[in-house]
Amino acid sequence: MCGIFAAFRHEDVHRYKPKALQLSKRIRHRGPDWSGNAIKNSTIFVHERLAIVGVESGAQPITSSDGEYMLCVNGEIYNHIQLREECADYEFGTLSDCEPIIPMYLKHDIDAPKYLDGMFAWTLYDAKQDRIVAARDPIGITTLYMGRSSASPKTVYFASELKCLTDDCDTITAFPPGHVYDSKTDKITRYFTPDWLDEKRIPSTPIDYMAIRHSLEKAVRKRLMAEVPYGVLLSGGLDSSLIASIAARETAKATNDVEPSTYDSKARHLAGIDDDGKLHTAGWTSLHSFAIGLPNAPDLQAARKVAKFIGSIHHEHTFTLQEGLDALDDVIYHLETYDVTTIRASTPMFLLSRKIKAQGVKMVLSGEGSDEIFGGYLYFAQAPSAAEFHTESVQRVKNLHLADCLRANKSTMAWGLEARVPFLDREFLQLCMNIDPNEKMIKPKEGRIEKYILRKAFDTTGEPDAKPYLPEEILWRQKEQFSDGVGYSWIDGLKDTAEAVISDEMFASPKAEWGSDIPTTKEAFWYRLKFDALFPQKTVADTVMRWIPKADWGCAEDPSGRYAQIHEKHIE
């Protein structure tokens, strides 16, 4: 994962270069390892690199051997080994997992993203046609923004974070996931079209527990593609604990197959998995896990149990309420949002990411996406029917790029730490989003708590020779929102502080430019003021989506799971 900035068809690109470098410097936190830039005709690409794969040779922008194609990527392409084999006639110049995008473009034109398995946001310049193509991964794990200026309407800008675009652009949009932009037509079109995207289509595929297990294991294995130390974010909840357990097993397997102590960094190695799904490299010989919370937080206690059970080298960090409050301005600056849920959950993740990076780790696995896929948020218990349950699930997955994916990407990349999310693997999504939603429904009378089928898939009861993935009390632990699990006093402290900072008079007088998007709580009002101080342009605010449960299901507007009625009913 890195940071990219691009300006296509700039009227004076060479004079603009110093400014482009300064704008890209605003996202150097995303790529502290190296900065690169290239100009071709009237287009400039700038890249801030975080080196994880192809460490010695993968600097960007990448240019084809004939100099006609220029590529800038923020992401990881997990099937790059297979893509290299498909493009054997192309002259590769690096070991980067991203370089195969160029020959895939030559082979498939704007359909190239369809063949990429990974998380990515990229721009590719074709000098022969004076054409730029930009694409974002299917779910929007990786951030990308697009901007235009009324003063220079022919110029198109792209950046990993919108703070790079605010100087030049009066129109900024979040680039839609699963889409590709082609300057030849000046249109953005969808390339990712799985059947489950149609929320009106209610699937009926029977449950296959072993298929779920094997698919998630493969998804984790793919994401251990790295030449640097990695770890897992471990909250002690179901999602992060499953990812940690699988990662510990896969790390042990990879360590046995490829002993890192014999790894020659100067030799030509391709990190990743082969056609048989076998992992060829291991960043560390043991898995390291990381947890954060207020002292004695529920997450910290659960994470200790999991780490001990799976044998990870565990690192526990605590923060005080004041440290969290002190970080809010930085969190909002990096996240570029005023959404209450995102800010609450991102602040501990932001603080933890700094600690992790200080320990020399560059990549972590994280558990985002499971709640959307399996209806794990506690308000899903109020779903009136399986059809409505599924429709809400699809909508939540579609909006992940504006919520949990944004949080996971920006709160970690603020410190040059890459977060990978196995639950959002393309194959895993295809499998799980096509399961009959009746199987996912929360049915207390039948003993089916939230994410029952995911828990059941990794329950080895009845498999006498199988090693358990998790302790039973963790596998069947009730859902906590991350911002709740780090300590209930975290949310209470935010609310109390907002009450003290925002007077009744202020709260009764929202800004006229907010229009109908008026904060309904003093906490939300406080965050919006902080956001506006950093990003006063309306076009920036228009990129923000507020995460709230479905009010028409009788749910409280406060997004904390603790305020959902179902939380009071501990389901056996």
From Swiss-Prot:
Q: Which gene specifies this protein's sequence?
A: ASN1
Task: List the EC numbers from the record.
Answer: 6.3.5.4
Q: Name one GO cellular component term.
A: cytosol
Example GO BP: asparagine biosynthetic process
Active-site positions on this chain: 2 (for gatase activity)
Which positions in this protein are listed as binding ATP? 233, 292, 366-367
Presence of the UniProt keyword Ligase in the record: yes
> Can the keyword Nucleotide-binding be found in this entry's annotation?
yes
* Protein name per UniProt: Asparagine synthetase [glutamine-hydrolyzing] 1
Organism, scientific name: Saccharomyces cerevisiae (strain ATCC 204508 / S288c) (Baker's yeast)
Species classification? Eukaryota, Fungi, Dikarya, Ascomycota, Saccharomycotina
Occurrences of domain Asparagine synthetase (ranges): 194-546
